[in-house]
Amino acid sequence: MSDTSISAASEAFEQLAEAIRHRRSVYGHISGLRMDRFAPGEAWSTLPYRPVFVGDSDTGVIHGGVVTAMLDESCGMAVQLALDGSRAIATLDLRIDYQKPATPGLDIKAHAVCYRVTRSIAFVRATAYQEEESEPVATATACFMIGANRTNMLTDRPAFTGAPPPLEAPDDPSGPFATSPFARCLGIRLADDDTLVMPFSQQIIGNPVLPAIHGGMTGAFLETSAIITVMRELGVDAPPKPIGLTVNYLRSGRALDTIASASIVKQGRRVVAFEARAWQDDAAKPIATAFGHFMLRPEPGQEHD
């Protein structure tokens, strides 16, 4: 390859990276997530700490869904950096393993690597950390579909114009999410039939062209549904600690309210296995399903070995 060809390829890649940096998901933009460094098939990103990201105000720990959404978007960046920027991508499945709670007040960083691309599928792994990548907060593996639809987030006109509303958590001292600012930020509410509802808003958009709900927001919603189900069915006051979550994405979340339900699959003395599903206008057509495990927190006067 001539020097001219190398220079042209390098310039084209720089332009692709800049497009990815500036034309991302709506949620990614308003959350403050930024791409710090890039290489072919690799992305390094940072999510600045914000009080609205807290999942349990009693401990100050960030909601697991915030980490899920960050890793989902960071993996998407890596996939786009492995491609030419002309094809739409969509998350097929995402597995998160939570290694330790994020330290309150510190930013979260991520390093995502797209390690293999076939004609239709991209395979990615990622690490979320705070100070050192060798001490992860969470790790992830994911599969993305290539050419998932006919949109191009990097060039097509968004469905909504104007600035989206900022991420804010309205006060609700007597509601089920009194101690979860992030759940309140998403507007999640408990319905009369004990399902949970996440109203559609511009804040939770992933693909702004369709528009479609951010896959990470769907994952956060499913995890929240499972947390509420476990607390309610076991009669515990403290939210359980997430161990792992696997989300399977079945169809795009459209510009509609989303409903979720969860159930306990197995309960041990310390660990609970759960499954959850989310749908929109037809419960028989879920947009995503999830399964995972929680660690129960000791009740006052109890100790876990």
Predicted regions and their residues:
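Terminal targeting signals and extreme-terminal segments of soluble enzymes
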Residues: 1-305
